[in-house]
């Protein structure tokens, strides 16, 4: 592609991007595909010869776009906003066109110096103390653009670790660094971003995760108590990460309380304002910043809430030398003669190579102005309040946490399963896209205002979709509850039938021989009794025994096994027994036994059939429920 074709294709690309954003609402917000879809549409081997540009762009529309989640879509309300604006896109285009790698001042002076100036602009815009600014008098601090908030957290943790080890080595010069490191402890809230845990893993430091209060806010008293306990066990607190605008519900840790605790213990305090920090350009929203003067480092992401495309995460430190001492590696081929008078940003982060990211941020601030950016943030806050009012007007819904900035956490009144089904059904439909969070063990749904040009109509439409699906889900859940109750009743009836079958088997002779139930009690199995004492099962034998007219209570080891037997029954010799048997109609006795046996067999067969029918019914219900 030569410059002439680039001019042509570049204009076409600008048109494609503009048309994409103008008509994005005509697309489904989330892709309706399965993992691995693209390998069946794109060759698994690279082409050996050049391909026509028109064919490439046709594949973008036919093969790539069906697998794209459209973060700029008016129906996208998941996560946090993905910053995007035309000035930012043009800034990235120019940065890519220049193609410099600004790892040092000498590598590209403008790349370095514009970054320093723009970071000072933004530090002043959000109200940071002058200690964090590069060009403030007597300041040792400064700002830098990192790739993400995760990088900011990792870099600050590494700086705090290195500084703490240096201080401890002065006190204990003969103790190995590994021993000192094993005693060092970092802290964060349970609501902190997962990148804090990952950073601790990468830095090989212990991390204690603390419980926030009922509003998901980490308090100073909680931190101080845990630190005192750890110090009593010989551990060394060295780093605390706090969040202003948590991912789950946009809560704010109380740095006004936490800051003095960190100062007392000589601990590095990092403040992560990835989302919430952007709002501090509005003076009326700076309340949570109270106490920021205690921080050692601070970050926020214009690529979330300031119309700047990813990647663009801003980090400030109060003492830049503590940061660079932890990361400096200075081979000869990277040194230059101006290093004493300039900033080399390669010492401020993990990567050596750095893009000219300050350009897009410079373009955005100049194109919108501070007031334009403030109005954008205030509008998102207003739209979130509009959605909150919808939730509060509907009795079957509840707001799950205080609403801050552009995020509303809500749920249906009911079980976690009900809310999970609601969100799953909405997302599966492609009509909206939201994500969940867990607050106080409750499953909640996060609704975030994300689109740059979001309107009242967008908010109202989203609420209508949610209420429609909520009604359907509640109807389905009610039907499932009825079905589940029926299944439970079936199981209960099955258990009852089994119990009755057992009782029927035990009491079968009592039902058959009503005329003898007053004189004979059948508590045990017929066959056991017949073997152990056959005479009591034939009233004629009992009546023929001497002394049958007078009875006494027969006592066995089982007090419940009682029957009326003759008093003073004499010992029966063989001749007497033979005579008694001759007087007894044995045919009648065995006929009686046969009748009772047939009844037992029939009863058992009937019960078996009933149990099988119950089991078949359960299997049918379970199959229908799974479908």
Roles of regions detected by a PLM:
Residues 31-35, 340-379, 388-416, 431-441, ...:
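Conserved small-domain helix->loop->beta segment predominantly found in fold-type I
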Residues 242-254, 260, 294-299, 369, ...:
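C-terminal, well-structured subdomains that either form a transmembrane helix-short loop-helix hairpin
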Residues 1-140, 345, 424-434, 442-443, ...:
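N-terminal entrance/gating region of PLP-dependent enzymes' catalytic architecture
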Residues 3, 98-106, 132-144, 180-183, ...:
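Glycine- and acidic
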Residues 191-193, 214-215, 245-247, 276, ...:
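Short, glycine-/Ser/Thr-/acidic-enriched flexible segments
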Residues 139, 151-322:
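Conserved PLP-enzyme active-site core in the AAT-like
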Residues 439-627:
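PLP-dependent enzyme catalytic core of the Aspartate aminotransferase-like
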Residues 265, 288-394, 402, 563:
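Active-site C-terminal subdomain of aminotransferase-like
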